[in-house]
Amino acid sequence: MADGYWNRQQSLLPHSGLHKRPRPDYEMPASGLPSGNEMHYLSREEDRSGHPMVKDSKTIGSAYDRYLQGQVPSFTSGEASTVGALGLQRGIGGLPNHSLSDPSAMIGRHGGGGPDLAPNGRGMNYGFQPPMDPVSRHGPEPALLPPDASPTLYIEGLPSDCTRREVAHIFRPFVGYREVRLVSKEAKHRGDPLILCFVDFANPACAATALSALQGYKVDEINPESSHLRLQFSRYPGPRSGGGPRSSGPPRGGHGSRGRR
């Protein structure tokens, strides 16, 4: 009977291999992917925490750093600030193995070539027009002055009662204007005195501008019989030491300066 009792007790004892109850709900399937229930469970956990669950983030970060180091060379602090201010980041334009010192890599972004780019990236002109040499600009050439041009104009056609202030009011707006000189001479025959007028400018170019603008100018627009101005370059420009005009303008009478001696 004793043998039968012990055989019966051994049959009632659990097998040594069955110490842990199998839990198929928490075991990973053979494919290595979580089941449908586990996927829903993981998504709910991520929604609660707000951060996705990423495995081995250190390995991913190191691989990304190696990728960046292999695509674009490193910059110095000064170069990085210059490139960063222009909105250019690493991996510019999706062009691998192209440095910023290669002009061909920048032609497509700015259209057309510019000045040579320095190897260190300094002095690069992104989208700015380089300064032009004033000599190389093609503009209208200034009008050629006649050979008898001078900085003094001789004026004819002024009324006999005009004043120096009135004449100066006509010529003062022109650039380079300096002064007006009026000389009144008695007429050979009875009549109004002859007014000699000289206007001095800074240079012949300024005098030529006034001559071109005022040639044929009508002094009095209300009076229909008003004379028109006639301007020409003076042959002997500049005031005389005595304050009067030089012997310029139209030829004088036959007695001239000899008759005064």
From Swiss-Prot:
Keyword Cytoplasm: no
Protein name as annotated: RNA-binding protein 1
A Pfam family this chain is assigned to: RRM_1
Gene Ontology MF: a single term: mRNA binding
Organism taxonomic ancestry: Eukaryota, Viridiplantae, Streptophyta, Embryophyta, Tracheophyta
Record carries keyword Metal-binding: no
Location(s), subcellular: Nucleus speckle; Cytoplasmic granule
Residue span(s) of domain RRM: 151-236
Alphabetically ordered keywords of this record: Nucleus, RNA-binding
Segments for region (Disordered): 1-38, 232-261
Cellular-component GO terms for this entry: nuclear speck
Expression sites (tissue/organ): Ubiquitous.
CDD domains xrefs: RRM_AtNSRA_like
Compositionally biased tracts (Gly residues): 240-254
Main function: RNA-binding protein interacting with the enod40 RNA.
